[in-house]
């Protein structure tokens, strides 16, 4: 008597096979689960406990933008999980130039078990997910930065032990992908996110509408304001990002607008939490806090500034958590990869979390 053929087993997981393209694609409980899973995997790593959930898997890493943290995090995370990562840069494949995104997605989806994409267009990463047939992870687009969010809120939870009710203040260009992702993710998780920026650099109405919709359920109080004192009052986390991106031509206008919003020790004191152990500083990096880089020297030469979005004093202070945050990129990305590709038993996630 011959045995019946074994068909593909059903995997009882709320994450298996899903793509992470934007935070709002997941529920607040699912985002929180990934945060906690990242903390768990970090503990396993620290104790040298193997966790090869992706043994035999092949991962395509597609980069249209240069990267230090995202590339290093995806590479080491994949290897720790037992997978093989393959880096394909802008000179290796040219989505939409020599081959359409759809055609590229179909080819890569037939060879790889999952795809990471760091680029510009949100539609492009969505099309990769639509046509590849495998999980796609957004390593950054002009609109959203979801993998960074898991790392960021891991870092917050590590430092405070909880999320709900905390206040995170992002100071800088409120229109960029980091501001978008922070205010939406914070509103999902019950964190009050304030965007402190000039009026012309506030998040779009569409982004604020998404944040406010989640805030109705979580109790968070998202805010966009140009008033620094109002915005930073009561902050537990002061967060910053670069003011300008490489290749932009409008540095001068942006620098003039944002110079009053540089994060200083005086700004930290405005929070009211600088002396009680309830305040940290975070930055997704790279940071222009001195003149030790070519761009730092160029900024000094053009604008007479030795510091940009944050002073060197704050960057090197007892409040600084940016390198802990950077390390957490690896652990959080590992959580995303394992949850969506590792055939893990995750039939449900707790709806209640703190």
Swiss-Prot record:
Record keyword Transferase present: yes
Signal peptide: none
Biological processes, Gene Ontology terms: arginine biosynthetic process via ornithine; arginine catabolic process to ornithine; citrulline biosynthetic process
One Gene Ontology CC term in the entry: cytoplasm
EC number(s) on file: 2.1.3.3
Keywords: Arginine metabolism, Cytoplasm, Transferase
Catalysed reactions, as listed in the record: carbamoyl phosphate + L-ornithine = L-citrulline + phosphate + H(+)
Record carries keyword Magnesium: no
Transmembrane segments: none
Subcellular location: Cytoplasm
GO molecular function terms listed in the Swiss-Prot or TrEMBL record: amino acid binding; ornithine carbamoyltransferase activity
HAMAP family the UniProt entry points to: OTCase
Similarity comment: family membership: Belongs to the aspartate/ornithine carbamoyltransferase superfamily. OTCase family.
NCBIfam families: orni_carb_tr
Chain's role: Reversibly catalyzes the transfer of the carbamoyl group from carbamoyl phosphate (CP) to the N(epsilon) atom of ornithine (ORN) to produce L-citrulline.
Name this polypeptide is given: Ornithine carbamoyltransferase, catabolic
Gene symbol of the encoding locus: arcB
